Design a protein with these regions (language model features):
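Short glycine/acidic-rich loop motifs that flank beta-strands on beta-rich extracellular proteins
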Residues: 663-664, 675-678, 691, 695-703, ...
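Extracytoplasmic
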Residues: 47-627, 876, 914
Length: 1005
């Protein structure tokens, strides 16, 4: 390569500075900067202070060289070669006299023939990956300009060949200059398209009337697909939301699309409705969050767009948010807080882009009682004509709503919908019969109520055994893996060992059902035992409960076996027998009144040697749901409830019939129905009478539902597997596969599966809501290897055999997936939540509690795949109770409640931890680390984890430190991080290699 050199012009936000003047009389001042799209040109050196690369601090193999011509100073810096990937860096120390925005211009050579990348760090924090276009050869030099906001004083600017970069460039110097403000492309708030920077075939035209200014811009034709663009340079007078209104013509007869880029980054695809003809003009407004100052707004005909429009002008104004919905008797559910998919975009306080079939928002609402309920949709329709959307309630079509024009103001449309007690979904969807084209702000539901602040909203009350009264033994807290206490909720339980032993509670609500989480002995050869336990209400025996330990007890090394003879495995954790608990559920013979005494008692006929009671759930179950109109029942195809026969073919035949005859879906009535092979799902609605009534039973191991396409709905049923040990080579999930676009899984209860949900690539916009995953042998929910735009919400997972909730980027990254309002409780192995690589994934408004082994409250890591973290990974508004645990087998270290851990590469995506409560962490509250951790003096790791933001984090009680780092560099910015009750101290910063920038409000460390 020689040492690692394009003559390029100075770039500014994706444009190239061609000259520093324009003649007066074209809408600009006499002195200005002219911008064009990136391309070849002669070099222009930015004015300002110049820092030679050979005088910078060099590391990781970066060296001074002189073997190529054209450099400034006494040499240039090379060594950014593949052999130094992950290490080579040049760090400039610059001085700023006054705070402001600065152009940082790097002079470089790149003779590789293609663009190469480096990473730019400011004061130790990575701010971006930069692209350095190819220069003509290694003796020619180009420049790359980045705009940075810098405070007065000294700063470090570091260009590093990170593990995610391609490197192989030479660096000559760095020029720092106060930013000159580019002129607006027009006068005032109106920017004419003919004055924008045009590229890729976009041209000025005048052959259609009605345009403003001196012309319009065309050329967005199929021949220029992937290239044509118009870039406006605009000025935002103040930080905030701004409405960017594009005036355009679209005479094609149908909606067309372009892509909108802000400051070089694509933010959305926009839809431009048809205008009457090419001489008529329409507008499209997008609300953008912009900082004060200059920005570029680029409208491009990307390869994924349909183009074929003309552009006239752009108007930028401060956005006026919709006024708050009028107050009334209803509860307001904000649209931007709901699940949405199908191209719908989120603005600061509402949703837009209901512009094509498949666009939808699903409101999750909560009621105290079933009723015909008034709901009011707050919307905006500035089209001048009526628009329509279809409305679905809990997945069933309810009506088509017509939304009258509103002009530029928000209005409301009220409907009456039949809603059930508890959680409901109300979907507003653009189907093929609709016209869409509205914005949606909120839904007001009369007699609606708030969802749980954190964690899943559930219909039952969970009561801990140790919180009741008992004459038996209360187990004391213990977190030693392999003990029954460590597997108990709150680390305590009650053990009934003698006839007459009981534990009892006062019922906080009326209930007609009961779930018991309990432990009993195993059979000597494994396989479990069956025994009874007695249920009393107000001193009178209500019924005998039939219990089993068949799905408890595992042995040996990972992944553990059902037999006590299962051998240990070298290098695998083997604590001895564990997985002591299982659960059983019961619809009761009569209801329990609120305030009644509920007692579990070991009577003379209850023959197990002991019953360890961890907790109970009390729930008032509603009556079975009826079959909706236009559904076909599986009983019409030979399925028989509760007969122990195989019903797989009947279900498959019903699905085939529903598709071929245009029926709305397939009905599975009350009762138990058996499957012994896979049931494939695509473009079908499968529905039951409710998870307490409709029960799908896997008669062997591994039968399940497989997603093979889009528009799948599975609602109101339970799946009970027949798994008794983990088999990573064979067993399947209850729900597995690709669910395409537009799918919904609601109110589904899963027990005794290997995995609850294993969602595969091709899934884009799945919503899983209002579910329970209990007693799985591996993960509860795993979004695996390329899942996009998917949300899991109001799901409660308990006693999973691996991560309760996991996003696992494996081969391909998961993008924009969210766990929100979920509860993860008592994973027997691993974490309550885990995010393995990916882009812009989120854990929000959730609760994790009582991890056991190899465990965190949330683990953020690249452990399993050499893939990056991109964008921002968010953990916000989450509570972790008694989480963290030993991780001695895999990493020879202990895990924090919040654990950010690197194994394969630098973690350079932003990690945001905000509004998080960490209570009684087993080890450290927050841990940031890298590698295996086997030695107190490991080989020095230079893979940074940065940037990290910790904001409004409370750590109350930790078995080790409040915050801990191990063998890792990087930077965390900390605001209002408080530590109390950490056994070993507030902070342990291994070798002082990690930088904590304390802003304000930090105490205890």
């Amino acid at each position: 390569m020689g040492t690692a050199k394009k003559n390029a012009w100075r770039t500014w936000g994706g444009r190239i500075l061609v000259a520093s003047w324009l003649s007066a009389g074209v809408g600009c001042g006499a002195s200005a900067d002219l911008f064009v799209e990136e391309g070849l040109a002669s070099e222009r050196q930015a004015a300002g202070s110049t820092y030679e690369a050979e005088s910078a601090a060099l590391s990781g193999g970066a060296v001074i060289a002189t073997d190529h011509a054209g450099y400034s100073g006494s040499g240039f810096v090379g060594g950014f070669t593949d052999g130094n990937k992950g290490n080579a860096a040049a760090q400039f120390t610059v001085s700023i006299s006054a705070a402001g925005n600065f152009d940082v211009t790097l002079r470089y050579a790149n003779g590789t023939g293609s663009a190469q990348t480096l990473s730019l760090y400011v004061d130790g924090t990575k701010v971006k990956q930069i692209s350095l276009g190819a220069t003509a050869n290694w003796d020619n030099w180009g420049t790359r300009t980045d705009t940075l906001s810098l405070g007065a004083g000294t700063h470090t600017l570091r260009y590093k060949f990170d593990t995610t970069d391609s490197g192989n460039v030479n660096l000559d110097n760095l020029t720092l200059s106060a930013q000159a403000t580019p002129p607006p492309a027009g006068s005032g708030p109106l920017y004419e398209a003919e004055s924008a920077a045009l590229s890729g075939g976009a041209v000025i035209a005048t052959d259609h009337p009605g345009y403003s200014g001196t012309g319009f811009v065309g050329g967005f034709t199929d021949g220029n697909k992937g290239n044509a663009a118009a870039q406006f340079t605009v000025n935002a007078s103040a930080t905030g939301n701004h409405d960017a209104t594009l005036r355009y013509a679209n005479g094609t007869g149908g909606a067309q699309t372009l892509s909108l880029y802000v400051d070089g980054t694509k933010v959305k695809q926009i839809s431009l409705d048809a205008t009457a003809n090419w001489d008529s003009w329409g507008t499209r407004t997008d609300t953008l969050s912009l900082g004060a100052g200059t920005h570029t707004l680029r409208y491009k005909f990307d390869t994924t767009d349909s183009g074929n429009v003309n552009l006239d002008s752009l108007n930028l104004t401060a956005a006026t948010p919709p006024p708050p919905p009028p107050t009334g008797s209803g509860f307001v559910y904000e649209a931007e807080e709901q699940f949405f998919s199908g191209g719908v975009a989120k603005e600061s306080a509402w949703l837009r882009d209901f512009s094509a079939p498949g666009a939808r928002v699903i409101f999750t609402v909560n009621l105290d009682a079933a009723a015909a309920t008034s709901v009011g949709l707050r919307y905006l329709n500035n089209s001048g004509t009526n628009k329509t959307l279809n409305v679905y309630v809990n997945g069933v079509f309810a009506l088509t709503t017509t939304l009258a024009p509103t002009g530029s103001t928000w209005s409301g449309k009220t409907e009456t919908l039949s809603l059930r007690r508890g959680l409901n979904t109300i979907t507003y969807q653009y189907d093929s019969v609709n016209t869409g084209g509205v914005d949606i702000d909120a839904l007001t539901v009369v007699n609606g109520k708030a969802l749980a602040d954190r964690g899943a909203t559930v219909p039952y009350q969970e009561l801990e055994a140790e919180a009741g009264t008992t004459n038996a033994t209360v187990l004391n807290p213990n977190r030693t893996p392999g003990t029954v206490e460590a597997e108990s909720s709150g680390r305590r339980a009650v053990k009934l060992t003698q006839t007459g032993h009981y534990v009892q509670w006062s019922a906080p609500q009326a209930a007609n059902s009961l779930v018991v989480r309990y432990g009993m002995p195993d059979a000597p050869a494994g396989g479990g035992i069956n025994a009874t336990l007695s249920l009393y209400v107000n001193g009178t025996k209500l019924q005998t409960l039939n219990l089993t330990s068949r799905h408890a007890w595992v042995y040996g090394g990972y992944p553990y076996g059902d037999s006590p003879s299962t051998p240990s495995k070298p290098g695998e954790w083997d604590p001895g027998p564990h997985r002591f608990y299982d659960e059983s559920r019961f619809l009761l013979s009569s209801s329990i009144p609120a305030g009644a005494t509920v007692k579990l008692q070991k009577d003379g006929g209850d023959t197990a040697a002991y019953y360890t009671i961890d907790l109970i759930d009390l729930e008032q179950v509603e009556a079975p749901q009826p079959m909706p109109a236009n559904f076909v029942s599986i009983t019409s195809f030979g399925a028989i409830a509760d007969d122990n026969g195989d019903d797989t073919q009947a279900i498959l035949n019903a699905i085939s019939n529903a598709k071929s005859t245009g029926r709305a879906g397939v009905w599975i009535p009350s009762g138990a129905f058996n499957i012994n092979s896979r049931v494939t799902l695509d473009n079908i609605h499968l529905r039951g009478a409710g998870p307490w009534y409709t029960r799908i039973q896997a008669t062997n191991i591994g039968e399940h539902f497989t997603g093979t396409g889009s528009n799948v709905k599975v609602i109101d049923l339970a799946y009970f597997g027949n798994v008794v040990e983990r088999n990573d080579g064979a067993d399947r999930a209850a729900f597995e596969g690709s669910f395409g676009t537009g799918s919904l899984i609601q109110n589904v209860w899963i027990e005794h599966a290997k995995v609850g949900y294993w969602i595969r690539p091709g899934t884009d916009g799945l919503y899983i809501v209002n579910g329970r995953v209990r007693n799985s042998y591996a993960d509860g929910i795993n979004l695996h290897a390329g899942v996009k735009n998917t949300m899991v919400s109001h799901v409660h997972a308990r006693n999973t055999g691996d991560d309760a909730f996991a996003m696992w980027s494996d081969g391909a990254i998961n993008e924009n997936c969210t766990f929100r309002h979920d509860t993860a409780q008592l994973p027997n192995l691993a974490n309550t939540f885990a995010i393995y690589n990916g882009r812009d994934n989120k854990l929000l408004d959730s609760v994790g509690a009582d991890t056991h082994y190899a465990s965190s409250g949330v683990l953020i890591t690249d452990w399993f795949a050499d893939l990056p973290f991109l964008g921002t990974t968010e953990v916000r508004r989450v509570t972790f109770n008694r989480t963290g645990g030993e991780q001695t087998v895999n990493f020879s270290m202990n895990a924090g409640a919040v654990w950010v851990h690197g194994v394969r590469r630098e973690i350079s995506g932003h990690i945001l931890v905000e509004d998080v409560e960490i209570n009684d962490s087993t080890f450290s509250g927050i841990k940031i680390s890298w590698g295996k951790g086997a030695s107190t003096n490991p080989p020095v790791n230079n893979h940074a984890i940065s940037p990290v933001t910790l904001k409004n984090v409370t750590i109350k009680g930790a078995g080790a430190y409040g915050l801990e780092t191990f063998n890792v560099p990087g930077t965390a910015t900390c605001t209002n991080v408080t530590v109390t009750g950490a056994a070993l101290g507030g902070l342990s910063n291994h070798n002082n290699r990690y930088t904590f920038n304390k802003v304000s409000g930090n105490t205890g460390w």
